[in-house]
Amino acid sequence: MKKKGFQRSDRVAEQVRRDLADLIRTELKDPRVGMISLTAVELTPDYAHAKVFFATLNSEHLEEVERGLKRAAGFLRRELGKRIHIHTLPELHFVYDSSIERGASLSLLIDQANALSDQTPEE
């Protein structure tokens, strides 16, 4: 039987992402975390673990941001449990998402290639 639309785990992962983003923005007081964006959440099938992918505007302080998130993981999990009622609340693992930086560098390379082709005289 073909599954239509989102599976339950996809909906739960998206809800976890939204609630964590709200908790980080409103409840987390750690200045190391600052301006981050949660890009995705991947849950294991048993919901025991969640990879929370994040991006930050200031990648120079990436290690500090990761330490702040790791330190706040227990607090965030506890607060998440107050918002989401599922049998197993996932343990949070924060992972830096470098796809935005990779996309920007690829876009720059494409722009440079286009600029070179515009400068090359046509025969």
UniProtKB/Swiss-Prot annotation:
UniProt subunit comment: Monomer. Binds 30S ribosomal subunits, but not 50S ribosomal subunits or 70S ribosomes.
Q: Name one GO biological process term.
A: maturation of SSU-rRNA
Gene that encodes the chain: rbfA
Q: What the protein does? A: One of several proteins that assist in the late maturation steps of the functional core of the 30S ribosomal subunit. Associates with free 30S ribosomal subunits (but not with 30S subunits that are part of 70S ribosomes or polysomes). Required for efficient processing of 16S rRNA. May interact with the 5'-terminal helix region of 16S rRNA.
Sorted alphabetically, which keywords does the UniProt record give? Cytoplasm, Ribosome biogenesis
Q: What is this protein called?
A: Ribosome-binding factor A
User: What residues form the membrane-spanning segments?
Assistant: none
Q: Please name one Pfam family that this protein belongs to.
A: RBFA
Family in the record:
Belongs to the RbfA family.
| PANTHER family the record matches | RIBOSOME-BINDING FACTOR A, CHLOROPLASTIC-RELATED
The answer to whether the entry has keyword Cytoplasm is yes
| GO cellular-component term (any) | cytosol
* Cellular localisation: Cytoplasm
Recorded source organism is: Dechloromonas aromatica (strain RCB)
Q: Which GO molecular function entries does the Swiss-Prot or TrEMBL record give?
A: ribosomal small subunit binding
